[in-house]
Amino acid sequence: MIAIMVLMQLCISKIVVVDDLGVTDKQNRDPDIARKVMNVLGGTIKNSRDTVLLSNSKGTKRIVGDDENASSAYDRGSQGEAKLFAKTNDDNKTNGRETHLRPSPSKPEYTGRPTQNLQVEDPVPEIGRGYQESSLLNPLHTRSLFNGDDQQIQGRNMYERPSMQSYDPENLLTPYDSNQGKYIPFSFGGTGDSFTGAPGYTEAPLEDRMGFGMGGNRNLSDEARARKSFIILKMAQSKQKESMLQSSIDKLLQDIDQVAEKIQDTQKMKDGMMSRLHTKKNHLRNLQINIKEVEVQRGRTLALIRLSRNELLKLSKMIDDQRSKLALLEDEEKIFSDRIKKYDEEYDVGNRELQLDETRTEEIKRSIEELERMYNVLKIRNNELLNERNKESAIRNKLEMEVERFDRSAIDFI
């Protein structure tokens, strides 16, 4: 019972890793991407020779073997690498032991529904099979993943299939445009796909399935190192993206400071213009008061003129005196008229200047509003970049915890 629980824990831990990589729960992904990731991770959750179970929060998928007589270009590339690696091991052997590396006749394919009553010719999985297939446990395959020259020498990409587009290892987990099948609900005791319903689940020895023994220990340690290298690579990418976001945030902060300085300068200009407007309005108000006072004085003078003319008719004796007084009053009235004209001209000039200043004030207000909108947009963009940086930091912390967990697992395993 304890051995079965340990086996289930190993299988479920592998499934969780696949699900965390985001290859089984997103739409519009390449149907073969999960199989590629499984090959890279070493294929330790296989429970028979050609059957693999994948699971996530939406359900379970089964990967079954192809026809042994039909092999694609992808299969032939993997078989050639396995043969070359097997030949190298044969040349380097010292104790006469034969290598376990043999080319696999087929690769697993996806099926959109559970497959029942699968016929398995060899129910006992070989220890070298997971090491032989395209995975990070195979040095030749690891070199082909990260060395594009070797793939060009072979004539085509090892991931190129007739019905799919070519993918590079660096964008292995990026979105794809191919359709992906629906998931079958996962169940441990129902009629769907499950660990116990897979063929050959209990037929193989427990040591081979759990990775015990010399071959199993080697596969487990190599797989842990491969997974750690993969996560370290993702951490480096996350750190690079975080540094780029930080540089963008610094640039935006500089722009925000410049806009704030412009707003302060414009506000100072606005304050100066408002003070000038206030002064000119007071001046125009004083001019209007003076005009009214002069008009009152002019009216008084005209009344005196009328009285004087009436007195000329009545007082002939005082004609000379009244004429002289009349001349003086007329001169005074002319002075007042000249003053009124001067005040009218000044009023017109002041009114035009007031209109110009009001127009400039409206333009300055609109400029301030535009600068404030730009400031708000930059602040919003800054907050978005800060949120993205925090998300990237959280992802990097999670990956660092995953690396520490792998290190502790490796130490505990040793």
From Swiss-Prot:
Residues 87-117 are annotated as: Disordered. Residues 88-101 have a biased composition (Basic and acidic residues). Keywords: Coiled coil. The keyword Coiled coil applies. This is Uncharacterized protein ECU09_1880. The lineage of its organism: Eukaryota, Fungi, Fungi incertae sedis, Microsporidia, Unikaryonidae. Residues 243-405 form a coiled coil.
